[in-house]
Structures are given as C-alpha cells and as structure tokens.
C-alpha cells in the first residue's frame, strides 16, 4: 500500500510554513530571535551542524517532525537496522549499517549471523593490508608493492577514490593508490603509463565479476602485467586480488580465491565504501585508521537510530531537502567542502543521492505525487567562489547549499605576508560566503557607500539563500565516516517521505543491456539496425569515421 505524503495534515501545515517563509527573510528571522543560531545548531558524531541560515523557524521544525512521524519514519528506521527486506523490488535487506557493527554486536538476518560475517571479512582485509604495508606480500620479481590500483566503477570506485583522497595525510606506509573506472582506454593508459609492474597490485572490484567496464579494464591490466613478466601467467596471482562473490569467475581470471574478499547482496554499491570495496583504502591508511573510519559511521548511525526527531540531524536535513525540493521548487543542491582533500565528495554524493532517489514511482509502482531527487553538484572552496557562486548569490534559482569545513588543518602554510595562516584565510572565505548568502546587501546599504545610482541594482545581493554549515575539528577517518553516514541517512529520510525505493537502480540496468545489444553493430560485426533512425545514423557515422 502506498503512502501519499501530500494527503497528510503535516504536509498541509508545511505548505502553510512555506507561505510564511516566503514572506519573510533570514534577516528578519535572526532579528526576531537572538537565540536562533543556538537553537538551530546540533552536535552528533563529532559534527557541528548549523541549520540557522535555512528558511525555517520553530514551527517549521515542528512540522518536519510531525511529518516524519506521520510517515512512520521511526518504524522504518528500525526496519532497516533490523534487516527487514525494505528493498521491495529486489526482495532484499538494506544493511550497510551492519558493515560498521561493533565486534561484539549481534545481528541475525535471514538465518545468517551478519555481524560475524562482517568481522570475518574485516579480519581477512586486515591481514591482507598488513602484508602489503609490512612488505611481506611480494610480486613476481620479489619486489614489495608500492602502488595499488583499484579497478571498479560506480560504487566500486567513487567511494574508495573519494575517501583515499580525503585521507591522504593518513597514508603512512608508502603505498600509493590509483583508480581506474572508465571503459575509455585513456583512463587505463594514463594510470599504467606511470607504473612499474613489479611493484603494482590490482584490486578488481566487481560483485559478480561480470561488470563490462571493470572486466575490460582488468583484462587490459592483466595483459600489461603478463607481458612485463615475460608471459608468465602465474604472475597474475601475485599482483591481482578481487572484491567479488563469484569464485568461479575470479579463479578463471587467474586470481587465487584465497585473495577474494566478498560482500553481500544487502549492500548496494553506492553504500559499500566501508565494506571490502574499501580494501584499497584500508591498504593505504592502515587497518587501525580504517576501523576509526567505521567508528565514525557507527556513531552517526546511533544518533540517527535513537535521537528525537527534533534534534536528529539526518532527519532535519532530509526534511529540509524535501521542503526546498517540493515547496520552493529547488531542483539542485550544492555541496561545497572547504577542503581540497574532500574534492571528490560532491561526485561521491551524486551517485549516493541521485541513483538512490532519482525515482518516479512509489513502492507499489504508482506514480509519485511530489518532486523527487535533487541534482547534487559542487566543488571545493574557494575554487567554486570564482566559478559558479555568482549564480547562487544573484541568479534567479534557489540553490540550497551545504558548506563543510574543519577547525584544524592537517597541514598549513603561511599567507603571502608570511605571518598568517592559509587555513584561516580559507575559513574566512567559508564564513563570509554563508553570511553573504544569508543576509545579502540591500540597495540602501550599497547607495550609502557612495556607489553611483546606475550601479546600485547590479550590486544588490538579495540574500535569503539557504545554507547548512557542517563542521568538524579535523578531517579524520572518524569525521569522514560520520559525514558519509549523515548523507546516507538523509537519502533514507527523503525516500521514506516520498515513499520510493532508495535502494534499487533499474535506470542504470537498462542502459547496460542496451550497450551490450549495440556493441556488435558499433564494432562493425553486424549490420546497423538499432530500431530507431537516429541511433542507426549515429552508429553509421561513427563507423565511417572510426577507420
């Protein structure tokens, strides 16, 4: 049975709050409540989250919590954590939260001791990562491993690539990580051209070991390695490991199945960075820091599972997104980390959020009655300020934005004078942007500065641009885990309100099937007959210019 949120009383209340918020400004909201920042700031899992620069007030937050309760949010959170099959289209549990269970936790799902299974794989990952880091794992020529190349796509790439970059200062064992995902041969060439096969190890990440792009890249890497080893196929077992559940295909490739690390069908790819998919990350930062990474996830899980909705950060942020998406008509959401090391975080969130909530039917197959799925995008600050912030400040579109910053840098440099801190300069920009977006600058204020009348309108900053500020003390493994889990749970909250399945991705599957169907024609092996004239003409043009 479907849940139509638009028929509920809290939805009607939220519509009234939208009308009220449209008629006010953030300047007015702050002026009327000196305690606003304190009342709308929250702490959980080492994160400080300030929601005060959003277009909400106490009555709006009350409507959020009422709507969450009306949707059965608490019961649905419990169902996910308990391993019920909430992914109804694939009849699966959704248990990424189990990947970070404590070692003494108990969770049995579908007759399996999930906690024990998770920690068995983690133990094997620790042993493998330790062997790379202490030099006991040797390649075909007895060299130690200096570079680990992760070959995967989607969730098998974006998560570990993002996290490895984010935690680069924790790479203490001299092991470098590179990532290949695109079936475009330029991706593999660019990586292999820099590497020494004797000291390179490949992690092939594919649950089924049949993913088209991943297998194409894996075989290219295998040919490169075997050629360097003088044609010795046995070298493969010393330079390849797999993250997969298909032992037969893994062995057929030449990988020793003792070096195959599994995960489960209750883990979606975009939720898998803290599973065996994180093997490359663990190898780079070490098992201890990887466990701290999991601790951060678990701390946010516990907050989400137990906190009252009035102070539950993922619930409030998820409801904010619904509010902006369905009432204000905001179609996009900017994520702006003021941390170069978090530069891949917006791309990671694109898959997490858009693959999860880019749906147009509800659980029962009926059409949704709301807008769903914001478009996520962003770049690190301050780069974004000199690229697209102009549109956020003075454009005609409302673009809610999340600003992410840290109190202490892992590394710092002096400013141009040699006396100040570049990190302080970075954060000065961070605070200035959220201030200007919220409060802007009026025509009267600009005119009072002596600006010529013909320029006043051009310089007006409307303000009232909503932002959420997320801060942590440092970008640590714990903080990154908590940050990822925060957004995972935001996705869940939105999915509950919209009554969509956030854990399937049929739109991705059809594209894969069509690509396989068209491949023979694209390769010139069969006549072009795709079923539509446009695709036929495009493939024919491609073939005629391919040479």
Swiss-Prot record:
CDD domains: SIS_PGI_1, SIS_PGI_2
The gene coding this protein: pgi
SUPFAM superfamilies named in the record: SIS domain
Domain of life: Bacteria
Cellular-component GO terms for this entry: cytosol
Active site (record annotation): 355, 386, 512
Similarity remark: Belongs to the GPI family.
Entry-linked Gene3D superfamilies: 1.10.1390.10, Glucose-6-phosphate isomerase like protein, domain 1 (3.40.50.10490)
Biological pathway: Carbohydrate biosynthesis; gluconeogenesis; Carbohydrate degradation; glycolysis; D-glyceraldehyde 3-phosphate and glycerone phosphate from D-glucose: step 2/4
Catalytic activity: alpha-D-glucose 6-phosphate = beta-D-fructose 6-phosphate
Pfam families named in the record: PGI (PF00342)
EC number: 5.3.1.9
PROSITE patterns attached to this UniProt entry: P_GLUCOSE_ISOMERASE_1, P_GLUCOSE_ISOMERASE_2, P_GLUCOSE_ISOMERASE_3
GO biological process entries: gluconeogenesis; glucose 6-phosphate metabolic process; glycolytic process
MF (Gene Ontology): carbohydrate derivative binding; glucose-6-phosphate isomerase activity; monosaccharide binding
Entry keyword set: Cytoplasm, Gluconeogenesis, Glycolysis, Isomerase
Subcellular localization, as worded in the UniProt entry: Cytoplasm
Protein name per Swiss-Prot or TrEMBL: Glucose-6-phosphate isomerase
Reported function: Catalyzes the reversible isomerization of glucose-6-phosphate to fructose-6-phosphate.
């Amino acid at each position: 049975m479907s849940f139509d949120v638009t028929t509920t009383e809290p939805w009607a209340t939220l519509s009234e709050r939208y009308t009220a918020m449209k008629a006010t400004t953030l300047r007015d909201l702050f002026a009327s409540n000196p305690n606003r920042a304190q009342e709308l700031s929250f702490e959980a899992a080492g994160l400080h989250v300030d929601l005060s620069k959003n277009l909400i007030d106490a009555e709006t937050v009350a409507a959020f919590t009422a709507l969450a309760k009306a949707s059965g949010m608490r019961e649905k959170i419990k169902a996910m954590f308990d391993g019920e099959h909430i992914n109804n289209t694939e009849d699966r549990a959704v248990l990424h939260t189990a990947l970070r269970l404590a070692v003494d936790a108990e969770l049995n799902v579908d007759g399996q001791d999930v906690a024990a299974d998770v920690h068995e794989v983690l133990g094997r990952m620790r042993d493998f990562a330790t062997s790379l880091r202490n030099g006991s794992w040797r390649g075909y020529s007895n060299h130690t491993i200096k570079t680990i190349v992760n070959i995967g796509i989607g969730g098998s790439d974006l998560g570990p690539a993002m996290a490895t970059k984010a935690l680069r200062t924790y790479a203490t064992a001299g092991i470098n990580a590179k990532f290949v995902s695109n079936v475009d041969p330029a991706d593999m060439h660019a990586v292999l051209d820099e590497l020494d096969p004797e000291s390179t190890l490949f992690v092939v990440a594919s649950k089924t070991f049949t993913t088209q792009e991943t297998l194409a890249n894996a075989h290219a890497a295998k040919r490169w390695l075997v050629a360097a080893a003088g044609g010795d196929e046995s070298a493969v077992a010393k330079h390849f490991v797999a993250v997969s559940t298909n032992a037969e295909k893994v062995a057929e490739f030449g990988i020793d199945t003792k070096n195959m690390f599994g995960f489960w069908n209750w883990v979606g790819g975009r939720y898998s960075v803290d599973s065996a998919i994180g093997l490359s990350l663990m190898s780079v930062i070490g098992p201890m820091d990887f466990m701290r990474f999991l601790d951060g996830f678990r701390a946010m899980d516990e907050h989400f599972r137990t906190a009252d909705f009035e102070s539950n950060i993922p619930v409030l942020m998820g409801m904010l997104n619904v509010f902006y998406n369905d009432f204000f008509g905001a179609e996009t959401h900017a994520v702006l980390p003021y941390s170069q090391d978090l530069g891949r975080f917006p791309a990671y969130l694109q898959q997490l959020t858009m693959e999860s909530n880019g749906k147009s039917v509800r659980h029962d197959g009926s059409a949704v009655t709301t807008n769903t799925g914001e478009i996520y995008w962003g770049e690190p600050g301050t780069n974004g300020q000199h690229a697209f912030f102009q549109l956020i400040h003075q454009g005609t579109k409302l673009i809610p934005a999340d600003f992410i910053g840290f109190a202490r840098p892992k590394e710092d440099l002096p400013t141009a004078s040699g006396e100040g801190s570049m990190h302080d300069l970075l954060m000065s920009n961070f605070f200035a942007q959220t201030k200007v977006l919220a409060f802007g600058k009026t025509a009267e204020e600009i005119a009072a500065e002596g600006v010529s009348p013909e320029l006043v309108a051009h310089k007006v900053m409307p303000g009232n641009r909503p932002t959420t500020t997320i801060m942590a003390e440092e970008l640590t493994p714990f903080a990154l885990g908590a940050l990822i889990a925060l957004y995972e749970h935001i996705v869940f909250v939105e999915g509950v309100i919209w009554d969509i399945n956030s854990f399937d991705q049929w739109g991705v599957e059809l594209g894969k099937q069509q690509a396989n169907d068209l491949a023979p024609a694209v390769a010139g092996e069969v006549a072009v007959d795709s079923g539509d004239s446009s695709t036929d003409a495009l493939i024919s043009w491609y073939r005629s210019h391919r040479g």
